[in-house]
Amino acid sequence: ATPRFVDIDLTTYLIDSDKIEKVINTNTRCILPVHLYGQCAEMDKIHRIADAHNLYVVEDCAQAHGATYNIQKAGSFGHASAFSFYPTKVLGTYGDGGIVITNKEQLKDRLNRLRSYGMDDTSSAQEHGYNSRLDEIHAAILRKKLTRLEDYIYSRQTIAGRYRDALADSNIIQPYVSANCTHVYYLYVCR
């Protein structure tokens, strides 16, 4: 596939959903919104566009563990959603790792093959694949840390509040939080 880039909304730094349809053509297969810096993209608009053009939605949730849009969690909107567990992420382990989630059976089967050298349950390679399995130690760390995800988010939101207060009287443009979103502040990006 050839990516077609869509500019950002300068207020939120997220994909400008009003510009998506301008880049859709007959070769377009999916829309890949990035939930950047800890805030979700406008998923209702994105889904309306995807439905109108019969496109898949694949969410990039690498920076948005626990973020919400209209009370719904990041990663629950798309046909597939990817999360990073790099150590600096809101939910990170002590090395590289990630996960792709889906409720589409056929896609799940393909993803399982791709992460395991292209092999299926019979240990027969069906296609080119990778060694992308999360090892047991990192899975155990994540399982334990997952129980504290809300605490990590609260801590980040508290620190963001301190930044907001400290910078309130400056000319610095601080992060905008959409009214229908919960921001988890993976980064506190200012201009």
Pin down the residues of each PLM region:
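Structural motif
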Residues: P3, A80, G97, Y185-L187
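PLP-dependent aminotransferase class I/II
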Residues: D7, D16-D18, K22, C30-V34, ...
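Short beta-strand->loop structural element characteristic of the AMP-binding/adenylate-forming
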Residues: T2-T12
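Structural loop-to-beta junction motif characteristic of Rossmann-like glycosyltransferase folds
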Residues: A1-T2, L55
